[in-house]
């Protein structure tokens, strides 16, 4: 059905989805499914949500993507709205959660280096956490099942701790 030609991060079900409406998905045979996963938590508005479809269509008719060497009018407008809502002074746009986490790791490492040098470069993460599928985000993920030997060596200076284990941070 395709599961032999499409490489997947997870074991796939032998179901080929065709379309969705709201929280309901339909496979190629018309069988109905309730999407409790919400596309692994990225489809919070559901499938085929008309205001979102219209906004994406309108933007795609103007321009699909602007290389990050340039600014875009809608990007700046959105950044201004985010900054006003949060009170922050700048915003980073990425393409995925893993990319956002990678940027956060770099910012944390830079801050640590500028405020303590080599001794302040450890990044602490929590047991049972998940941070993404890049090598650094896998390293940060606090679940051994995501650390197979075939992906080694993993990034250095990550430490997984139990929630609220303040002693582990101080040592």
What residues fall within each predicted segment?
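PLP-dependent aspartate aminotransferase-fold enzymes
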Residues: 80-171
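Glycine-rich, flexible loop/turn motifs
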Residues: 6, 13, 33, 41, ...
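Active-site-adjacent loop/helix segments that line or gate small-molecule/cofactor pockets in enzymes
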Residues: 1-21, 38, 161-162
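Glycine-rich loop-to-alpha-helix module at the N-terminal edge of alpha/beta enzyme cores
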Residues: 32-118
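Short, acidic, Ser/Thr-enriched surface-loop or helix-capping motifs
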Residues: 27-28
